[in-house]
Amino acid sequence: MSLPGLELTQPSAESQSASAPPTQINLSAGSEWRFEVAFGTTVRVKLLTGTAELFGTELAPSQTYTFSGTKAAIYTWHGCTLEVSAGDAVSGLDGTTSASGRGGLGAGGCQSEYIAEETPMVEYANVHFALEGLRAEAKASGRDGPRVLILGPEDAGKTSLSKILTAYAVKVGREPIVVNLDPTEGMLSVPGTVSATAFRAMLDVEEGWGSSPMSGPSAVPVKLPLVYFYPIVNPLEAEGSVFRPIVSRLALSVMGRMAEDEDAKETGIIVDTPGILSQSRAGALEMINHIVTEFSITTILVIGSERLYSLMMKSYDNKPSSSASSAASDERISVVKLSKSGGCVDRDAAFMKAVRESQIRTYFFGNPVPTTASSALSISSSSTTNVTLSPHAQQLDFDAIALYNYTTSSAEEDQNDEDDYDPAQLTTDSFLPGNNEAESASSLPGLNSAANASAAAAAGALVPLKKVPGPAPSALANTLLAITHASPTSSPSEIRDASTMGFLYVADVDSERGKIRVLAPVGGRVPSRAIIWGKKWPAEVVGLVG
């Protein structure tokens, strides 16, 4: 269409929406292609020739992979050729494509992409082979396999290294147990959780760790995570009084799995940690020591911090491990320094917010990004499909649920928090076990019932967890609720230490009628269990439903 007087032609809608032709990228042996894709856009990658891997998981030849909201790198040991093209736009939580979701100027619409010749992959591979040697020794002597702790500052590549070591272990037939202690990102779960999973099958190239059991199809075998809810962004909050016992419960479950599963025992565990533990904060070193002790760590990998490496060397190198099976063999801790990859980039607050929203949306609605799941469903291998889930909506009487909320907060939040910490509310008999009756609490040897009741009340007061009274607070809207395995009348410590059954999303709150409308991943009545409110973390997720 011509513009009058200017003799210029306005581009048609078809020409504007036409995507650029695919770009071929040739990688030499030992190099990697680093790329960043914004949320709201997709980039398709196909391996044409050679071999390549993404965080240790090999790409299948001639298979199209779709990425969105990703910062990653594809590495090749022997050289390869990739085909990169722009994919379709993906709507956000509100059904629209955000301005930040426009494609970039790189190949296929990537925000940033380049080829790097210098990578730490040889170091990481050497770590894998060293761990394999330790696993072989453990099998021969009947001991537990290596227990690996990964430390480093924020955005140093700790999770990427965890994926690489896990993928390499699975590739040689091992069964590593991976532990995620970072509540800012969920592993096979939503943000605000810590979890552990035994990996028997390959990781998902497009979705990272893969997916937990769901009612929809999956191209990669699903994993079964053990999840604990920690709705606080800082593990050191309240001097670690909440995070520390959760770590202990998770470690107890992991060690129990290793005792019963011979494959997991021989392979060992890999523990990923939050970057805040590597900062010079009060309580950080104590928390690291707690993790080392509870998981009987034998190998500490430090990435991107000379100060932390020096501190770990002084504190742990060549010191005896706390493993029960190491008493006879005198197993000792090794501290190893690894190089930080040049591909590690800072993830700003806006990107991390989008990551959290994407994980929560995927939990309830499935993945909106077209994936390769169609090939697993015997559909045309050249096509892709969306894995769409339909959550079940239902109304709940607020007075009929046992909703609890953590009252720990930073000094800044204390000034504006309507739920200020009140120890008096934590010492009421409503937190005592046995249907709110102090008399039904189990007796302690050598103590009378009055002393036992006082001890139980004092123990409950130490846990910053209180029951949310009616009417239903409006702040519940657009937040997550975690259904625990604890009964509604359990003590605060029992609720804190209970693992999670699943999550609800509060779509609407009617305070006048005392009802809330929630989304659940499965149908049926909500179990009568203690429910924990994710008020402060992962906080509000607006626009999940219309």
UniProtKB/Swiss-Prot annotation:
Subcellular location: Nucleus
Superkingdom classification of source: Eukaryota
Keyword Nucleus: yes
Protein's name in the database: mRNA cleavage and polyadenylation factor clp1
Biased composition range(s): Low complexity: 9-24
Residues binding ATP, per UniProt: E32, K71, D155, A156, G157, K158, T159, S160
Keywords in alphabetical order: ATP-binding, mRNA processing, Nucleotide-binding, Nucleus
Region (Disordered): 1-25, 410-445
Subunit structure: Component of a pre-mRNA cleavage factor complex. Interacts directly with PCF11.
Its biological purpose: Required for endonucleolytic cleavage during polyadenylation-dependent pre-mRNA 3'-end formation.
Annotated family: Belongs to the Clp1 family. Clp1 subfamily.
Alphabetical list of Pfam families matching this protein: Clp1, CLP1_N, CLP1_P
GO MF terms held by the record: ATP binding; polynucleotide 5'-hydroxyl-kinase activity
GO cellular component, one term: mRNA cleavage factor complex
Composition skew (Acidic residues), residue ranges: 411-422
Broad class of where this protein is predominantly found: nucleus
GO biological process, one term: tRNA splicing, via endonucleolytic cleavage and ligation
Keyword ATP-binding among UniProt keywords: yes
